[in-house]
């Protein structure tokens, strides 16, 4: 093989033979290093050899002696290169020893020539000395040997190079290069072995990872199977629950039917008994007419002589008369005993049934929930085939049956003697007392809203069984009664009023139920072109003060438990209570007068027991909700509006609020009638009645559009009044009530429009929503503090013809920066993803009232950030669709973990509510919101506050912090709150400070010059308490104090030397003292305690709260001794013992 090295001017061709093989070289051929490694070594050697050859050629031109050495060195280098080339030639054909590779080597050599030229220039500068040239050549040889990678000793190579050229030196260099190559190959082999081991370990780990992934996949498949099984079990459970509810519903209806049948049977039995008694009484009356007419309370007078058909002597006739009289008396006594026993048995049965109902426990432990579960849903709960309440059934059946028994007893008592009359009257009086006690218990129960329907509509086919036979028999028998007996009977009957005929309803078929749901006074005329007259016309049969109907309150009466029923709203005692009394005594003048008295008594009893009193607060309970679902009176906006005390002066704002309130009451009745008309229209359309549907639809839509525009105009007027006029606290309360009620009415109207326009489709909105009817927000609430049960309430609103099969509990969620913070969230200052944020956040909807109460408790703080509440309910329709019913978000609030966070959190809430993403707001709008927050911070009632902010206070704040401008900006608010917030913090959390403020002992907003003017003419020791203007949140005491000045005066006398005298002058001035933290430090040292210990303060100026004017003048005050008015606020400390005379000296 020939290798050509291109120098600067010379080129040498070296013919080398194959080196002698050795065991080491043969062994290394088995495992060769990678080709990339050899290529790099080859390139390095070639570049170094080229450099050395060029340097040697340059040195040859300068010194002939050095030519030999340079040639020898070049030969050695060429031999090494030839050995390396032979190694490369022996590589397998798969290696990169191709001509292209050799061409790359030559290219590297050509590239290195340029570097050699630079080296030649450097060497030319050093050619003056031959010895230096030799040394340079030797160094170059050493570098060449090192670059070849032989790994041998540099000293040996240098010795070989410096020796004269010979064959032995050439062979030695070849052997050293082969050894270095062997060492390199050995190192490469070791590296490859370690790489192979690492690859095997990697493959092992990959196999383990694959096995783990297979296990995870198996677990996932098992979990999916378990989930599918659980879902199947849940579906089966749901089906079983539905079947169970259906069976309970059927059982409930069957029990109702049996009870109705029992009542009918009892009434029929009473009728039969009455008929028998009437027959006996008629016979006795025909035989003993004169004796009965002369009967009185003192005894039985002997019967007068009557012409009998005699078959013998008068004695026989007298005996026969006595026998007949004894037989009749025995029969009457037996009948009386039977009736009394029946009455006692019936009362015992009723007591047992009531005790069973009281002892009956449902799944949730609530009686109303038991009824709802038995019915399956609150929609089926409102079916007209059910009675209104269980207590009503007990009361009606007992009153109705007992009235018949009383008639029977009265009829039988006509022919009794004196003893019989007295015993019967005693029993009746006892029964009367029991009934009065029962009525008193009913009076004490909560009132419940209901509809009053036409008596005739419920009487025909649906009401109580007719009592015509009883009334007729009692009327016939009472025609022959005397004055005393008639008076007793009428008094007893007069104290008991018959139940309203619409209380009990007969079980009917679903078709009959649909007909029964349409009251006579509210029948929709299909032929009529509009329902405007129906909506605007008054309904005589239906109460004008009733509440909106809904899916929970159908046209018929709603069943309810006795715990939620009050007889004042349940029964109409004035309808037909006196007909029987007026018909009982139509033959006696005295009886007629007694009946008139009884009628008056009945009317008075009716007024006391119930009736609709327009002036009483309870008269508007039927108007209690602004939505169609029944609510408790506590949610009644109309009643709450009336409880708010009117303003001191009747202002145009007060008149406007009262006018909108009256319009709202009319709109409630309009929406109520609209509900009934729309429900009838939708039911007729679903049943296939297509007469004038389009005309009725257009009429409903036009009426709803008009009502919607009216409601929106009312909201606009209220908001305008809120932002343009400074209102009094009571007016603010009324305005908030009206805003809440009108907005709920508007939501209800939108549901009706949605239902009418869209209907129920799978892709269409469902006419149902949740509304927050009561909330304490916006407010700052402490962590772990639970809200009261009635402070946060949510109500379900639905359309007119909505059928809901079941529903889930309502769930409350936190909304923070438009993100829901559920139980698994950690955005509220916790890193535990499973930690709950709210306690009692899931509540069940009341199936009767449609309201859910949330006494929630917050378990984490919100880091001074505003959050809101959002409620979600899932309902299942009759079509099987599951729909999520959301609510709008609540007002913002902040949960704090420490009281020191209250100031900043309250400022954030106040700023968010006032500006509401605006740059500036009007001054009246800011004042109205500030007034509400101030009353809440000082824990005053918004309906009738003790001491709200006055006009003088607002003027002070406007001039001090806002420059008297009509608008408030963000910058002005920040400067205002930096002082006002700390003052409110002190007012809220310092002991006795809030009470002192409300009682007028603290002047909060006073300038220094105004204080000086107030105290200018006061006696020494008079003081006032106010908040410091220079130190926010600290209290200042301004008082009238004294200053003493000493003056020196000299006096001379002829006999004595001149003397100097000191005179003291006292002057008064107004002083100001800043209360320090040490003055009121400790749990039992308050501001009143500090004032009691300071002798400089004797009399305090107290504001007259009742006379605070709503003007910009200084409030009126009065001067009071501090120990008299502040004594209740002093801490009760143990008095120090009197140590005088006990051997101890006091410490001065």
From Swiss-Prot:
Its main location: nucleus. Disruption phenotype: Cells develop normally and show no evident defects. Still, these cells seem to be at a selective growth disadvantage. Gene3D superfamilies: EF-hand, Rel homology domain (RHD), DNA-binding domain, SH2 domain, STAT, domain 1. One of its GO terms (molecular function) is DNA-binding transcription factor activity, RNA polymerase II-specific. Residues 37-47, 525-541 have a biased composition (Polar residues). It comes from the Eukaryota. Keywords: DNA-binding, Nucleus, SH2 domain, Transcription, Transcription regulation. Residues 997-1122 form the SH2 domain. Pfam families: Dict-STAT-coil, EF-hand_12, STATa_Ig. It is found in: Nucleus. CDD domains: SH2_STAT_family (cd09919). Residues 561-572 have a biased composition (Acidic residues). GO terms for biological process: cell surface receptor signaling pathway via JAK-STAT; defense response; negative regulation of DNA-templated transcription; positive regulation of DNA-templated transcription; regulation of cell population proliferation; regulation of transcription by RNA polymerase II. Residues 1-81, 93-178, 268-312, 403-425, 453-645 are annotated as: Disordered. PROSITE patterns: SH2 (PS50001). Residues 1-36, 48-81, 106-178, 268-298, 466-517, 544-557, 574-610 have a biased composition (Low complexity). The keyword Transcription regulation applies. Belongs to the transcription factor STAT family. Homodimer. Does not form heterodimers with other family members. Transcription factor that regulates gene expression during development. Required for optimal cell growth. This is Signal transducer and activator of transcription B. It comes from Dictyostelium discoideum (Social amoeba). The gene is dstB.
């Amino acid at each position: 093989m020939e290798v050509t090295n291109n120098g600067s001017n010379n080129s040498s061709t070296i013919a080398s033979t194959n080196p002698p093989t050795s065991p080491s070289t043969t062994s290394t051929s088995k495992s060769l290093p990678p080709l990339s490694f050899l290529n790099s070594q080859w390139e390095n050697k070639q570049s170094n050899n080229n450099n050395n050859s060029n340097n040697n050629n340059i040195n040859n031109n300068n010194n002939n002696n050095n030519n030999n050495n340079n040639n020898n060195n070049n030969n050695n280098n060429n031999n090494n290169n030839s050995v390396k080339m032979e190694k490369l030639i022996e590589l397998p054909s798969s290696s990169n020893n191709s001509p292209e590779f050799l061409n790359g080597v030559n290219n590297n050599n050509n590239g290195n020539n340029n570097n050699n030229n630079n080296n030649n220039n450097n060497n030319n500068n050093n050619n003056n000395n031959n010895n230096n040239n030799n040394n340079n050549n030797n160094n170059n040889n050493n570098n060449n040997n090192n670059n070849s990678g032989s790994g041998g000793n540099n000293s040996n190579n240098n010795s070989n190079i410096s020796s004269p050229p010979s064959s032995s030196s050439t062979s030695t260099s070849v052997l050293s290069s082969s050894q270095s190559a062997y060492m390199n190959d050995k190192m490469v082999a070791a590296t490859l072995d370690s790489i192979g081991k690492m690859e095997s370990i990697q493959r092992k780990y990959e196999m383990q990872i694959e096995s783990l992934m297979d296990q995870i996949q198996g677990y996932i498949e098992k979990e999916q199977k378990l989930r599918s099984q659980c879902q199947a079990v849940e579906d089966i459970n749901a089906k079983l629950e539905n079947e169970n509810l259906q069976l309970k519903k059927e059982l409930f209806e069957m029990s109702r039917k049996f009870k109705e049948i029992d009542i009918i049977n009892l009434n029929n039995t009473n009728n039969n008994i009455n008929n028998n008694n009437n027959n006996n009484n008629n016979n006795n009356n025909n035989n003993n007419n004169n004796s009965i007419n002369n009967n009185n309370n003192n005894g039985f007078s002997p019967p007068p002589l009557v012409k009998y058909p005699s078959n013998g002597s008068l004695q026989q006739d007298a005996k026969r008369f006595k026998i007949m009289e004894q037989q009749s008396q025995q029969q009457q006594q037996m009948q009386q005993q039977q009736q009394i026993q029946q009455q006692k048995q019936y009362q015992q049965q009723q007591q047992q049934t009531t005790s069973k109902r009281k002892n009956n426990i449902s799944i949730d432990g609530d009686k109303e929930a038991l009824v709802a579960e038995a019915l399956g849903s609150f929609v089926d709960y409102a079916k007209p085939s059910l009675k209104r309440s269980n207590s009503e059934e007990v009361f009606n059946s007992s009153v109705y049956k007992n009235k018949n028994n009383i008639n029977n007893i009265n009829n039988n008592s006509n022919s009794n003697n004196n003893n019989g009359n007295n015993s019967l009257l005693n029993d009746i009086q006892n029964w009367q007392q029991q009934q009065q006690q029962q009525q008193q218990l009913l009076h004490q129960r909560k009132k419940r809203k209901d509809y009053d329907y036409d008596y005739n509509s419920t009487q025909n086919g649906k009401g109580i069984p007719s009592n015509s036979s009883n009334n007729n028999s009692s009327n016939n028998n009472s025609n022959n009664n005397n004055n005393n007996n008639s008076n007793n009977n009428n008094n007893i009957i007069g104290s008991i009023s018959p139940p309203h005929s619409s209380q009990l309803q007969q079980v009917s078929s679903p078709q009959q139920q649909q007909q029964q749901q349409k009251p006579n006074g509210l029948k929709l005329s299909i032929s009529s072109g509009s329902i405007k007259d129906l909506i605007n016309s008054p309904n005589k049969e239906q109460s004008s003060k009733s509440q909106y109907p809904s899916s929970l309150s159908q046209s018929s009466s709603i069943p309810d438990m006795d715990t939620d029923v009050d007889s004042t709203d349940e029964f109409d005692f004035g309808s037909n209570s006196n007909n029987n009394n007026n018909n009982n005594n139509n033959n006696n003048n005295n009886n007629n007068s007694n009946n008139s008295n009884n009628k008056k008594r009945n009317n008075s009893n009716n007024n006391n027991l119930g009736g609709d009193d327009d002036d009483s607060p309870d008269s508007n309970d039927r108007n209690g909700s602004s939505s169609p679902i029944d609510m408790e009176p506590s949610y009644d906006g109309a009643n709450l509006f009336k409880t708010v005390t009117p303003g001191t002066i009747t202002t145009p704002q007060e008149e406007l609020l009262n006018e909108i309130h009256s319009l709202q009451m009319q709109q409630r009745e309009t929406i109520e009638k609209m509900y009934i008309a729309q429900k009838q229209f939708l039911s007729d359309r679903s049943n296939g009645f297509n007469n004038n549907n389009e005309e009725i639809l257009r009429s409903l839509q036009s009426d709803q559009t008009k009502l919607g525009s009216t409601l929106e105009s009312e909201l606009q007027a209220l908001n305008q009044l809120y932002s343009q006029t400074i209102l009094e606290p009571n007016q603010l309360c009324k305005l908030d009530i009206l805003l809440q009620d009108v907005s709920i009415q508007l939501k209800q109207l939108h549901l009706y429009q949605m239902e009418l326009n869209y209907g129920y489709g799978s892709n269409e909105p469902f006419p149902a929503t949740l509304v927050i009817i009561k909330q304490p927000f916006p407010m700052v609430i402490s962590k772990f503090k639970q809200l009261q049960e009635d402070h946060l309430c949510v109500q379900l609103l639905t359309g007119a013809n909505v059928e809901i099969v079941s529903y889930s509990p309502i769930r409350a969620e936190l909304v923070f920066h438009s993100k829901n913070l559920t139980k698994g969230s950690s955005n509220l200052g916790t890193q535990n993803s499973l930690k709950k944020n709210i306690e009692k956040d899931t509540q069940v909807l009341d199936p009767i009232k449609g309201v859910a109460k949330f006494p929630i408790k917050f378990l984490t703080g919100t880091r001074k950030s505003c959050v809101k509440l959002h409620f979600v309910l899932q309902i299942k329709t009759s079509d099987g669709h599951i729909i999520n019913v959301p609510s709008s978000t609540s007002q913002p609030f902040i949960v704090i973990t420490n009281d020191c966070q209250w100031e900043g959190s309250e400022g954030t809430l106040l700023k968010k509510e006032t500006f509401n993403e605006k740059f500036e707001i009007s001054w009246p709008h800011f004042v109205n919101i500030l007034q509400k927050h101030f009353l809440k911070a000082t824990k005053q009632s918004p309906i009738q506050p003790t001491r709200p902010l006055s006009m003088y206070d607002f003027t002070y704040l406007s001039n001090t912090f806002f420059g008297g401008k009509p608008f408030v900006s963000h910058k002005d608010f920040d400067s205002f709150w930096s002082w006002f917030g700390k003052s409110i913090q002190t007012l809220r959390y310092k002991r006795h400070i809030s009470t002192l403020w409300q009682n007028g002992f603290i002047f909060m907003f006073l300038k220094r010059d105004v204080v000086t003017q107030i105290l200018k003419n006061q006696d020494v020791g008079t003081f006032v308490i106010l908040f410091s203007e220079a130190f926010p949140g600290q209290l200042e005491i301004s008082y009238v104090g004294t200053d003493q000045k000493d003056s020196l005066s000299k006096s001379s006398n002829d006999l004595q030397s001149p003397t100097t005298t000191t005179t003291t002058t006292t002057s008064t001035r107004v002083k100001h003292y800043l209360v320090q933290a040490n003055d009121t430090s400790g749990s039992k040292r308050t501001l009143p305690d500090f004032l009691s210990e300071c002798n400089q303060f004797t009399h305090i100026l107290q504001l007259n709260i009742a006379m605070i004017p709503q003007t910009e003048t200084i409030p009126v005050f009065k001067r009071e001794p501090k120990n008299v008015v502040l004594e209740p606020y002093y801490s009760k400390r143990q008095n120090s013992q009197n140590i005088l005379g006990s051997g101890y000296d006091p410490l001065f």
